[in-house]
């Protein structure tokens, strides 16, 4: 028998219980189950637009499945994890949790929903169909061995970079990021508060947050950046290009490749032996650029998307 509960705010005990479940899932799948945005919301105990839905084993009271929703700037993020020992119940548990999650979203005005799944199966497709979601974007995780081959580095135009200065560069970075990702559902529309939440993360290191300023004009202008990440608690040998972008007004100058190589060189110097990044499957230009640097596809992540109608519109 299973009991279900919904929390709009998580106590330290709730967070500890769910963290143990997430750790078990991560160990089984060798994959972090929640993205940074969802994880920060959980760790902070919830904020406006947060809900944590838990399925507990009646006999022991232990969480065996967890679903979380978090409101973003223009959409809702949703995720579902099931204890590896109870995955024979994925359809039953997932259907119950996801239906309650979408009910909450509907009651809070509805909107666009994104559910990201690593290695989507027929069960995920069935669960998505039950809550009227359909396949959307597909992300490729690509990896490359570090350090890069010398011929790759030699064939890349070197550009001057400097490390992000906390308390100084936030506004310039937000301007370029939001221009570059103006239509992106997750990376667009960042605020200083959201940036500061990432800066408070244990893995944040400004020395690996590389900025390229143009200095041959009257005022130094941020033209591109490469934000790298090494989560030493997860795997100190994998270095991620967390976010990379070129201001749209400076496209076509090869800055994307130059900043990618600069970021990978930094990660190698910090001890990473594998470089990793995510890219949309339909971004063929970026994929071609990364392939020339030696990247290959490691796995795919599928988004299930849909529009949840506000309950107010249904009455």
Write out the residue ranges for each language-model feature.
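Short amphipathic alpha-helix that is part of the acyltransferase structural core
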Residues: 1-38, 154-188
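Conserved donor-binding loop and adjoining core beta-sheet/short helix segment
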Residues: 8-10, 23-107, 223-238
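Acyl-donor-binding surface of acyltransferase catalytic domains
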Residues: 71-75, 84-159, 304-306
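Active-site acidic-Proline motif in GNAT/NAT acetyltransferases
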Residues: 83-86, 247-249, 253, 281-282
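Conserved acetyl-CoA-binding loop-helix of GNAT-fold acetyltransferases
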Residues: 89-103, 243-246, 252-269, 287-292
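Conserved beta-strand-loop-alpha-helix junction that forms the acyl-donor binding cleft
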Residues: 114-124, 248, 277-287, 304-309
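C-terminal "cap" of GNAT-fold acetyltransferases
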Residues: 140-160, 273-284, 294, 299-315
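Phosphate-binding active sites in nucleotide-utilizing proteins
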Residues: 181-228
